[in-house]
């Protein structure tokens, strides 16, 4: 219930932790842009921000970002990784809509030049998803995310159809796992080992 949700938010904030509401659906059906739906979604964001101190909201739809920015000028708005921000022009569009933070598409995780360009020219904070679980350029990803978006309105889970789909690809070529866009963080031990090897 809403009261339970607000209660959880209060506990988190009392612990000194910032709260980020994630509303990054990639599809909300045919009524997504209906006035009633928009008023409900933006009204919820406004109430959570103004009455309950929510600091951040994460959205995937640039139209919702624009509406949220107009309603809550001081709210931190983060563009979700599901916004598929995979180039400068797309990042610019989301910045103009009102996003101040972006989790870029995982295809940019290792493109340091473009990441720097986006950050410096648009003045936004960038976040990277380091534990990407999807295959690189997965043909099922868009449809999987749409299914999850629709299922989020129901009390049933999404099932495992897409897990099997991805599993079939990996079963045919296990190397696809290593082609995914996860980031491997070097530990101090491995860095020291590399320096030692270089010295030798």
Predicted regions: what they are:
Residues 95-101:
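A cross-taxonomic marker for long C-terminal extensions/tails that follow the last structured domain
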């Amino acid at each position: 219930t809403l009261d339970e949700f607000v209660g959880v938010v209060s506990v988190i904030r009392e612990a000194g932790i910032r709260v980020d509401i994630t509303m990054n659906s990639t599809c909300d059906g045919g009524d997504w842009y209906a006035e009633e739906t928009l008023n409900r979604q933006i009204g919820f964001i406004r109430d959570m921000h103004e009455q309950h101190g929510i600091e951040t909201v994460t959205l995937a739809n640039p139209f919702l970002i624009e509406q949220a920015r107009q309603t809550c000028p001081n709210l931190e708005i983060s563009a979700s990784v599901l916004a598929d921000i995979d180039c400068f022009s797309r990042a610019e569009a989301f910045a103009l809509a009102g996003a101040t933070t972006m989790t870029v598409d995982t295809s940019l995780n290792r493109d340091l030049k473009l990441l720097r360009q986006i950050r410096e020219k648009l003045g936004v904070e960038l976040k990277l998803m380091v534990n990407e679980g999807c295959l690189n350029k997965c043909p099922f990803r868009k449809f999987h995310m749409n299914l999850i978006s629709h299922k989020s309105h129901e009390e049933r889970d999404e099932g495992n159809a897409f897990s099997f789909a991805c599993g079939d690809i990996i079963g045919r070529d296990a190397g696809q796992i290593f082609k995914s866009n996860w980031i491997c963080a070097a530990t101090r031990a491995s860095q020291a080992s590399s320096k030692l090897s270089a010295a030798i």
